[in-house]
Amino acid sequence: MKAPLGLVLGATVVQANIVFHYVQPTCDSSSLNFSGCLPGQVCVLNNTCVPASLSTRADAPPREDGRCGKDFDDATCDSEDDYGGCCSSQGYCGKTGAHCLPKNGCQNGCESSTTSTSPQPTDHEPALGKPEETPTSDGTCGAANGGSICGDWELGSCCSMMGFCGNTSAHCGAGCQSGPCDQVPVSPAPGPVPAPPHPTPGSFKIVGDSGVPAMHAALMPNGKVMFLDKVENYTKLNLSNGRFAYSAEYDPVTNEVVPLRYKTNAFCAGGSFLANGTLLSIGGNGNLSWLDPEVEDGWKGLRYLTRSASDASLSGEDWIEPGNRLDTARWYPTVQTMPDATIFVASGSLNGLDPAKNENNNPTYEILDKNGVTKGESISMELLVKAQPYYMYPFIHLLADGNLFVFTSKSSEIFDVGGGRTVKSLPDLTGDYRTYPNTGGSVILPLSSANDWNAEIVICGGGAYQDITSPTDASCGRIAPLNEDADWEMDSMPEGRGMVEGTLLPDGTVLWLNGANKGAQGFGLAEDPTLEALIYDPAAKLGERWSTGAKSEIPRLYHSVALLLLDGTVLIAGSNPVDMPVLEATNETPFPTEFRMEIYTPPYLSGANAEKRPQNVELESKELKADGMTFEVLFDALDDAKEVEIVLYHGGFVTHSLHMGHRMLYLDTGGFEAGKTEQKVEATMPPNSNIAPPGPYVVYVVVDGVPAMGQFVMVG
């Protein structure tokens, strides 16, 4: 069946893409310091800001042939040689204005536009116009809101380029329209730093076809992977009624995929697992009745998918939607299962319309009970209100004290859900925006009793604004939120990345995949795909944590996913950066819909390591409690084995570079005997559900860094 390559939509409230409007700042080309432009822009002679064609990858050395720039491994030019020190838009080194001026597309070594124009004669004296600035009445401000100013607005006096009042670096920094704006860049984040190749880089292999665009994904208790998408005008799977399927279940063992049916549009939803192991998909978008009249409005949708490690009859069953609804509509919400098994749901657009308008936004949270049914109240959350319009898909992690770390835009806090209050506001993370539509990635590093389960959180990547010209951020921040003097430790990837996602690996490292070196989230808004795997070792010294892995051949841009499988490999799928599926690349659509899936084999299973897996793993119990209980683990190891880790792993719900609920624990162990082949180890569960909230987990036995096949357990 040939897929349609485009679709003309009629008038509708359903939105294909949220557009973030911002006021482009002017600049001072004579300034030798901060000109006033946004990151990734330069000030030209007429005092306007234009995109700079500059790479945000670490500089590469000059080539002997005088070629340079993005098409030549980001090579730079040597100002001392005969060619010249500027790289032109066409990738040639030179020294003329065609090579060196940013307005002509100079890529690196560019000249700064610091020459001011001559003052013009005038026949009148300067005069100040009558002030027409009106203080805000609703927290919006600036050119798009009648020129209003923030004045003494309770959240802050700076008017951001997006038209909201506040006092964070996102308001008072680059693009600030009025108020006490910073006159110099705020604590600039470090740029890209080259990383050495990993001695065992791993490998990518194309393994099959997802059947539907993989916008959302989760590893289910039956070991299979759920893919969930929005309503489309084409997928590769059909339901029994002849219509397209928008969800699928993939078996990594047999490489088979089967269609799943849902009733409400799950476009850009959130999700989490209930305590009983059921996957819950939350929120979505409106119905597209002209495409599929059988799929209804999903703004308040609640969808349930149940699978079991012991009951194979559940595999292939459709989503269940008994009619439960959220209290308020939510498009782009984030979800976290709490220690008491309730579900915390935060943020989302009410209608997909302009996020610069308060009436379109939902900067609130609501609580669902342990069965995934709303308790019926949406409560305003100040951090989200202040972050507008960068309030959607916030990063959320559960901490050891039962409170939440919540991050959005550039700001974060510790939030007490039970008390509905901010416990502690944390310092802003320097650099660009980190959440939608310039999402980077975030992980909570592996937890253990060695430091009393104290969490450290890493956030990497991001971007400056929602446009294909936006530079991406190479910097990463790492913070221990519960520390008394919590602050960000800065580090850098070897290149800027937007839409990069971090996946915890059983050996304690973090794999970073997917994304782009330029642009933002949205349809057709990114280019220069980042194809290389990056490996982060949190135990290494600062400056030595990053290495580069293997390189994929498949761009993974907007709407891509990555997650760990039971065998310790990583499944990568998706990339659908278009309104409706496009199957072949064209000049207008260089990055079509991607159905091919890949497996990334990490270093610990590469080469000779593949033969070192622990074998014959037996768990004393698969019903575990986070109350300090112990259980025995039997397994066979090589006769030269030196140490073991028992890992408790929750993959969470994956979408838009977020891994909601994702966490990994090292359990305390005893009884391991180095050099013995038949092992019996006692593992101790964490002391409470703050550390391991209830739900499905995978146990990995890891011997000398190599994991055995994982086994699903339920934690209560």
Write out the residue ranges for each language-model feature:
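Beta-propeller domains
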Residues: A189-P192, P197-K205, M220-R261, G284-G286, L384-A520, ...
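Beta-propeller blade signature
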Residues: F244-P252, D297-D311, N358-V373, S412-I414, ...
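Immunoglobulin-like IPT/TIG beta-sandwich domains and homologous Ig-like subdomains
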Residues: M226-L237, A245-D251, F631-P707
